[in-house]
Amino acid sequence: MTDFPPSTRRRFLASSLAGAGALAGLSSFPSAFAADGRKTDTLRLTWGFTGLTFIAKERGELEKTLAKDGIKVEWIGPFPNHAPTLQAVTGGTADVSFGGSTTPALAAIIAGSPLVFTQFLVYDPRTTSIIAKPDSGIRTVKDLVGKSVAVNRSGLGEFLLVAALEKHGIDRSKVNVVYLNPPDAAPALASGKVDAWSMWSPGVDIARVEHNATDVFLEGRDLDFQIDFTSYLTRRRFAEDNPSLIRAFNAALKIEADWATANTKEAEHIAQAKAGYRDEVRDHLISLKRRYTLYPVTDQSFVTELQKATEWLVARKVLPEAVTVADHLARV
């Protein structure tokens, strides 16, 4: 596992700062917030082919809700996973990340990105899984020894692999960890360039249908604790300048979460129409009856749990150094 040397952190910032508005995002923060106001009526939201934000985008109601407050939504994307959206937000080409793993968000903050959490999301059941094709010879976690496993760096995939190996007493050095983003990992698994893949829905669900992949370690079944959560982030300066806008977005997304929880079948049909996966995948996702629960950054109990999770990740070098979550919360 990589220990994220300072040069890596500089590269992250260099790529992020290429976007417009980066200098404003990194300038000194004002001592007083733009009380109850906002300096823009436009909110640029990132999106990808998964998750609550994707469903909200395709449903089209979130824009209508925010329009009642005079807020115009612009969609930036698609993005393959959370980390690139964090770079877009850091660089100023987008305003809010699309709701992804807290782990790359924490890694970006450690690397120096001026990001703050605006809210958190927990979905249930947890469906992230380490999967392998039938011809891989992998049936159990112990079979991963000497094999290659694709994961997204400092993300949900890497966390699950680390947790699975630890639970079964396997040293990480005995597994060949291959860092790939989802668009590259899926064909790598299909072609046999990697032996297994640690991934979330719908990627794992598609692989089960198209390649007869099976679960080696399923988060909701095989792990009795949760370390990684879903999170939304913006630039610290943007939150300070636009507290009412962030509050309005949080409230609008709560409406979407409640709707998606109560209307699983319709939500999954909406997602499939854009993502284009098979009906078998859609029907499996419908059967999960996924529930979405949002937590505000003012929820001290949740923040405490996230801090414990952060320390777990630091101890296992998934994150390179300690970070205090409470120092990186939007004050809106």
Write out the residue ranges for each language-model feature.
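Secondary-structure end/capping motifs
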Residues: 240-318
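Short, glycine-/small- and polar/acidic-enriched structural segments
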Residues: 35-170, 176-179, 195-201, 226
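N-terminal secretory signal peptides
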Residues: 1-7, 11, 16-23
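Pocket-lining segment of extracytoplasmic ligand-binding domains
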Residues: 103, 183-273
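Conserved C-terminal helix/tail region of periplasmic/extracytoplasmic solute-binding proteins
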Residues: 310-332
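Periplasmic-binding protein-like
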Residues: 121-132, 213-238, 291, 326-332
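Cleavable N-terminal signal peptides
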Residues: 21, 32-33
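Short, solvent-exposed loop/beta-turn-alpha elements that line the ligand-binding surface or hinge
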Residues: 63-71, 221-224, 293-302
